[in-house]
A protein has these predicted regions:
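Non-heme Fe(II) oxygenase catalytic core, chiefly the N-lobe of the double-stranded beta-helix
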Residues: 2-245
Length: 245
């Protein structure tokens, strides 16, 4: 029960939408994709002959979208760049569970579109679950209307700890130097102050940070509100190493 089949959404194939490496999609084709995403939340592209990160890079290039790089992001995950547009999802070991989340919703900047590609299928499991956040918001509003009203009014502040060196055993082990794109503590403090974060240094050289209040619900110009935050992931799996309450 609840499992989506291919009849539940649109699967795009080369027969329906030809995409050639090096050839940008025309306006009408991009409108078709945008309309499908607005209706379903995602689109599945199948049989486009991708087998490598470079193939995937070329596929993405056809959409002519701005490149949101891992380096400039505040992503908590340890990731490796494969091309200028493609990076790994997370370097944590398979036994680390990655809970449902909204990509980088705990930061001031986040991507507007995401593409996923499986280069090597998992030996067991490995599927990427997708949840319609507009429908999740409707369900939550019906169950907890006061909570939703509070989210709308106040937003959410996030606190997490960043280690001094990358911890690949953690789903959120990116170091503060890499996350903030700095080389020393003075630069880190200046960067966080500029962005409105509060922070404190930990005894092991790590850094505990707290964001300013960020939106928890938004409509992103699409005409329908969505539940956009990291409340589920933070409650289920975030490990804050400092001793703040």
């Amino acid at each position: 029960e609840g499992t989506m089949t291919t009849s539940s959404f649109t699967v795009m194939t080369p027969a329906k939408l030809p995409i050639s490496v090096g050839t940008p999609l025309d306006g009408p084709s991009k409108t078709v994709i945008s309309d499908l995403i607005n209706a379903h939340g995602f689109v599945v592209f199948r049989d486009y002959g991708m087998s490598t990160a470079q193939d995937f890079h070329g596929f993405i290039e056809a959409f002519n979208l701005p490149n949101f790089t891992y380096t400039e992001s505040f992503s908590n995950a340890v990731r490796h760049n494969r091309t200028s547009r493609v990076f790994t999802a997370n370097e944590a070991p398979p036994e680390v569970e990655i809970f449902l989340h909204h990509e980088m919703a705990q930061t001031l900047t986040f991507p507007g579109q995401l593409f996923f590609f499986c280069e090597k299928p998992a030996e067991k499991g490995g599927a990427t679950p997708i949840c319609r956040s507009d429908l999740a918001l409707l369900a939550l509003t019906a169950l907890r209307p006061e909570f939703v009203s509070k989210l709308r009014a106040l937003g959410v502040r996030y606190r997490n700890s960043m280690p001094i060196d990358a911890d690949v055993a953690s789903g959120q082990g990116r170091s503060w130097k890499d996350t903030l794109n700095v080389s020393n503590a003075e630069q880190a403090e200046a960067r966080l102050t500029e962005l409105g974060y509060s922070f404190r240094w930990l005894n092991d050289g790590g850094l505990s940070v707290q964001t300013p209040a960020l939106m928890a619900i938004d409509e992103f110009g699409r005409g329908k509100d969505v539940f956009f935050n990291q409340i589920v992931a933070a409650a289920a799996s975030w490990d804050n190493a400092d001793d703040d309450p």
